[in-house]
Amino acid sequence: NLNREYSEQDRQYRTLCIKNSVADDLFEIKGAGISDCRYKQLYHNTNYWPEGTKTPSKLYQQTSTGADYRHKDLMPLIRLPEMYYIAAECRISGPDKDLGEARSLLQEVRKARAVYEELDADLDEAGLMAQLEKEYRKEFICEGVVFYFYKRLGYEKLPRQSDVMSGSKVIDDAVYMLPYPDFEIQSGRIQ
């Protein structure tokens, strides 16, 4: 029954939507991000709360057998923007620091996403890392890549996470370390 299937999907999307104000803030639509194609293409408007919400459109996958079906449930291992972000991170905090090169790498991805406003030339290391984090959050919605970014950099509190969600606790290895699969434990393959 198509109506039942839609309502099942609808119920799932309601749990994964964000308020318009949060999406607008993330993509800086009152400033440089007004033309960001990620904002326009990765979200669709939903109205689950009175103030309006957006749901990531990458979560919706058609269940037909059409030409797009072969891409259902697939996720790339790495994408070109992620390689640029990794290179920028190395230029910001690695042994071969070059803040100008890091800024250029970030700017190249931003331009490819229709964000043409140049990053401030006076951004220091902390400012560039903050900008890099923002770009990760925009680019990798619902992919889990941001989790590994936070883990790699040792974030102790996840940005935009309320104390209600975290219980005011510090995020540590207990959160970042994923549990071993049951099969690994049962077969004694853990080393």
For the regions a language model picked out, list residue spans one by one.
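Acidic/polar-rich alpha-helix caps and helix-coil junctions
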Residues: 1-18, 22, 28-191
